[in-house]
Structure formats: C-alpha cells, structure tokens
C-alpha cells in the first residue's frame, strides 16, 4: 500500500480553488503577464538596436581601422627604407 501524501486530499484542492479566486492573486497574475510582455518587447528592441550598432560598426569602423593599419605599415616601410639608404630620420635633423 502506498504511503499517504500530506496535502493530497480533496480539501486541499478546494482551498487552492478558493485562494486562486482572490483578487490579489488575479492582480499578481496580471502583473506577471504584463512584466513578461514588457520584457519580451524590451528584448526585441534591444536586439534590433544591437543589430543596428553592429552593422554600423562593420560598415564604418572596420574599413577605417584597416586603412589606418595600412597607413601605419607604409610609414614603417618608408622609415626602414630611409634608414637602409642612409638618410637620417626626420626627427634626427633637429
């Protein structure tokens, strides 16, 4: 024979039914549903904003970074060639 569980009687279901009919419970459910709705909307708009920021960065900032890096490399190559040819660097003439 299975052991009797505490709180599994018929009286408990009627107590739960009575409690769930209270106005405060329905207000709590409504507040929870509203919070979920607002959270979903916020996540959706945050995702859109992140997409816009990411694509803007890729379109505008990445080419700029690559161009600056290439300019820096060309400057280093010019400096190295100047030092190999024996011409003094620009800062050494002062």
Swiss-Prot record:
UniProt xrefs under CDD domains: TOM22 (cd22884)
Gene Ontology CC: mitochondrial outer membrane translocase complex
Molecular function GO labels: protein-transporting ATPase activity
GO biological process terms, semicolon-separated: protein targeting to mitochondrion
Membrane-spanning parts: 49-66
Domain of life: Eukaryota
Topological domain ranges for the Mitochondrial intermembrane compartment: 67-94
Entry membrane topology: Single-pass type II membrane protein
Entry comment describing in which tissues the protein is expressed: Expressed in roots, flowers, young cotyledons and leaves.
Subcellular location(s) of the protein: Mitochondrion outer membrane
Keyword Mitochondrion (UniProt): yes
Positions in the Cytoplasmic compartment: 1-48
InterPro entries: Tom22_pln
Assembly and interaction partners: Forms part of the preprotein translocase complex of the outer mitochondrial membrane (TOM complex) which consists of at least 6 different proteins (TOM5, TOM6, TOM7, TOM20, TOM22/TOM9 and TOM40).
Protein purpose: Central component of the receptor complex responsible for the recognition and translocation of cytosolically synthesized mitochondrial preproteins. Together with TOM20 functions as the transit peptide receptor at the surface of the mitochondrion outer membrane and facilitates the movement of preproteins into the translocation pore.
Protein name: Mitochondrial import receptor subunit TOM9-1
Species this chain originates from: Arabidopsis thaliana (Mouse-ear cress)
